[in-house]
Amino acid sequence: MVRICIQTPILLSFLLVLLFFISNCFASSQNNDDDKRIRVRVGLVLDLGSVEGKIVRSSVSMALSDFYDNHNDYKTRLSLLVRDSHGEPLLALDSVVDLLQTEGVQAIIGGNSLLEAKLLAELGEKARVPVISLNSPMSLSLSKYTHLIQATHNSASEVKGITAFLHGFDWNSVALVLEDHDDWRESMHFMVDHFHENNVHVQSKVAFSVTSSEDSLMDRLRELKDLGTTVFVVHLSEVIATRLFPCAEKLGMMGEGFAWILTSRSMSSFHDQFIDDLTKEAMEGVVGFKSYIPMSKELHNFTLRWRKTLPVEEVTGSEITRLSISGVWAHDVAWSLASAAEVTRMPTVTSTLLEAIKESRFKGLSGNFQLDDMKLLSDKFEIVNMIGSGERRVGFWNSNGSFSNRRQLSSTHDNLETIIWPGGSAQSPKGRSLRESGRKKLRVLVTSSNRFPRLMKVETDPITHEITIVEGFCIEVFQASIAPFNYEVEYIRWLNGTNYTKLAYALHSQKDKYDAAVGDITITSDRSMYVDFTLPYTEMGLGIVAAKERSMWVFFQPLTPNLWITSAAFFVLTGIIVWLIERAENKEFQGSWPQQIGVVIWFGFSTLVYAHREKLQHNLSRFVVTVWVFAVLILVTSYTATLTSMMTVQQIRFNANEDYVGHLSGSLIANAALTNSSLRAMRLLGLNTSEDYAQALMNKSVSYIVSELPYLKILLGENPGHFLMVKTQSTTNGFGFMFQKGSELAPNVSREIAKLRTSERLNEMERRWFDKQLPYTTDDTSNPITLYRFRGLFMITGVSFAFALAVLLILWLRERWEILVNSVNIYFSQRLRHFRILFTRTIHPSPLGLDNPIGENAVQMAQRNRR
């Protein structure tokens, strides 16, 4: 017994030493394995002071831990380098620059806002490093970045779901409530366009910022209520939403008959710690769209383990209560990065980290992970109903464009469970349906000066003073633009003259009386302070019109003097060259010198009309004439076209009264333009109608008329052929319709005007009311043809003439070659003999008298005579 007791401590000591040795060996081997592993550095830039930042950080860390527990044999390890951006895009940018330069990170996770995503994407493009953005809004401005990966909501699918939801309840008129920030405005543009394409009328659109006061919220909501709006689509963050809904409840807008729909981006920004009991109570009955992540065993287990890893103070303080969709995306993104890092380290793989991420395929917590056009999109949405302090799921919006619910319980909406609306009613609000509530009356002020009836004509009953006729180009455009919105229009005559700035102020100050104004109203900056203008529906700018002046010498103007002289010289040169070629054999080119000169000139100029009667016998002369006739054809054709243009629109010449300029009486626009240095005049003459314009120009009371283009088009249309638009300047903004400040009709009508313009209907209206084609201007007149423009033509002709002369010279030399050779030989032999004699006498001088060959010959002759 004693022996056993003695041996037991020894045995235990031995076992402890053995275990210690084994553990050290295992640890050392593990450390050796860790040293052999390749570290891939990844930057994680988040707002660590926000709930989303904390969720994403913890989710990424836990995801990497799980990944390498499951893949312990991998040779790579992601090393997270976390930086706090404090919610500031510039701090995030600075952090990423530091990570790239000092740490050499190979990927970046960050960029939750639109601006932050753009900044980080720019760096990613230059450094060729993938940037993964979580929950940043979809935007066309981000599509150009090839190294940016987005995990976000599918905005297109969501907008289709909201539109189908509205149509299901027969709501075709809504108000949009959004946050005045780039992130929220950007994603709202697609929604507005989709609503318009699907006949959902956006009655009003209001924007709030985080700095908006409660009074501002109340005032804007009260305006919406006064408009009769009952259906609202809300797209803003929880910071504003928690203040908006209590204000709406105070105004009675969270009761029966109202409907509020929250977008998925708004719903994903809600966290329990920001929503107090008052806000939860006010939001009862609100319907929201949320990106749907199907619950799975893996997601459930991960969420439970994730909550256990959170600090105690965050769990007990209810700061973080659930894993957000950004946290789920962060988990899957971390797995794809870890998998891609391992793939790129394989010796047989040449893919970059970005390419490996794009090719990643696995089943993650959010479902099947697969990038589509550099995006990980959530295109299925669950529809929740805010009840009490929580949410109740009432159905799903599927990517195939249909609604469904798990219980298959029917409600007032197909395939959705029963919704409890604001006020506690299960009966769906009727909304502001124009088909049910009838046509809304639109009270429109119309200008009634009747100075240009083709633009605007208003007639009233002399007894009742009620408007009996409203017509004109402006009215037709307005009626075509407002027709899609099914308004009953009530026209009200404006009786205070042509001061349309006062008209704008009246529309602004008397909102209870007027909704819009129509007429020949120019868009100006001072008027836009009071009202909202539509797009211009007329041409923009001023024009100058003057009377045409006929010229008796217009036929000289198509060609410049240099071209006239050069053409005449080539006509004569053609005759000379043909005469040189034909005169030896052709009798028609022979005769006395006066006759031959006449033939040369006649033949050259007769080619102008192809009327030369002389028959050519030499092919060389035919070649010369063919080339020149081609040149003449081009000259004549160009001359005819230019002369036609000049006779259609002749240059004008102002009359002697250069100090008189006509303009529309009372037009502030024309008066302001005439003070410009380019249109300055000594004296102005105010005119009232198009008839006054025409009479003043015809009797030369004014030199020209300066007015806006629509007025001048009417003048030219009523007096075709008498006047000419000399010049135009884009110094005005054209005519537009005026609406109340903030009215949604202004952008909607602008969109209809754009459609009228692109469909050519607007041009048809102009032709019908102005009764003419587009006016000719001096800009339409062709410039005279210069010699420089035809230098190539004359170069070709000159080279052809030179070639013909060269051939003629060669033929002449060949015919007279023997005679020329003999003459040359005789000439050179005589010169050689004289040279030899001169050379001989220079070397051996002769006796006196003998050095003169003439003297020598004389002596010899004398001797012969003696014999």
From Swiss-Prot:
UniProt feature coiled coil, ranges: none
Annotated GO MF terms: calcium channel activity; glutamate receptor activity; ligand-gated monoatomic ion channel activity
Membrane topology (UniProt): Multi-pass membrane protein
Name of the gene: GLR1.2
Record localization: Membrane
SUPFAM superfamilies per record: Periplasmic binding protein-like I, Periplasmic binding protein-like II
Family label: Belongs to the glutamate-gated ion channel (TC 1.A.10.1) family.
UniProt keyword terms in alphabetical order: Glycoprotein, Ion channel, Ion transport, Ligand-gated ion channel, Membrane, Receptor, Signal, Transmembrane, Transmembrane helix, Transport
Membrane-spanning ranges: 561-581, 591-611, 623-643, 793-813
Annotated function: Glutamate-gated receptor that probably acts as a non-selective cation channel. May be involved in light-signal transduction and calcium homeostasis via the regulation of calcium influx into cells.
Cellular component, GO, one term: plasma membrane
Pfam families, sorted: ANF_receptor, Lig_chan, SBP_bac_3
Protein name: Glutamate receptor 1.2
InterPro entries the record matches: ANF_lig-bd_rcpt, GABAb_receptor_plant_PBP1, Ionotropic_Glu_rcpt, Iontro_rcpt_C, Iontropic_Glu_rcpt_pln, Peripla_BP_I, Solute-binding_3/MltF_N
Glycosylated residue positions: 301, 400, 496, 499, 676, 688, 699, 748
Tissue-level expression: Expressed predominantly in roots and siliques.
Species, as recorded: Arabidopsis thaliana (Mouse-ear cress)
Any Gene Ontology biological process: cellular response to amino acid stimulus
Domain of life: Eukaryota
Extracellular side: 28-560, 644-792
